[in-house]
Regions:
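Internal intein/HINT superfamily modules and their associated LAGLIDADG
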Residues: 1-167
Length: 167
């Protein structure tokens, strides 16, 4: 679910670009429903593997081997969707070891050093089963480098990042 109008606008534009028809939104609508069948061919062509659990997800090889501008867009999107900008650091959590280390490798191209710690956490899906999650954080000089090179689409996160970089 997302109520950020910039994110919703981007979803509409991307859907249109790929020929996916989505209903005209109501003023109160904060979500779009896109059937998986429409997205299947687009993401399969990019190397996305369907039917995997979160812990088994990977960053597609085409992203890891792509030009830096493409990797930059991918990193920005991950932080827009999953990231947190705190008072002292930035972070995101993932159940996938592969995604954590893939992000670490991509961020190093930009001079950003990602720390990865494993923590037992429950998913947000309501089950209270604890599983290992990879908590990925960066702070210090890496904040300044991230803020200088990346622009987040989520305005509240971008503003928080700019404030953090000024400290």
């Amino acid at each position: 679910y997302n109520s950020d109008q910039i994110v919703l606008s981007r979803v509409r534009k991307l859907a249109k670009k790929y020929g996916i028809v989505i209903p005209i939104p109501k003023k109160t609508r904060t979500t779009y429903v896109l059937s998986t069948s429409r997205l299947y061919s687009i993401f399969s062509n990019l190397g996305y593997l369907w039917g995997k659990k979160s812990m088994d997800k990977v960053i597609p090889k085409c992203i890891l081997e792509s030009p830096l501008e493409t990797q930059k867009t991918f990193v920005q999107t991950i932080f827009d969707a999953e990231g947190y900008v705190g008072k002292t650091h930035c972070e995101f959590a993932t159940a996938s070891k592969s995604i954590a280390y893939g992000m670490r490798d991509m961020l190093r191209h930009f001079g950003i050093w990602l720390r990865i710690n494993v923590s037992m956490k429950s998913a947000t899906n309501g089950t209270k089963i604890k599983r290992p999650y990879f908590i990925c954080t960066f702070g210090g000089n890496s904040i300044d480098r991230f803020a200088a090179q990346f622009k987040l689409q989520t305005q509240r996160k971008q503003k928080a990042l700019e404030l953090l970089a000024k400290k």
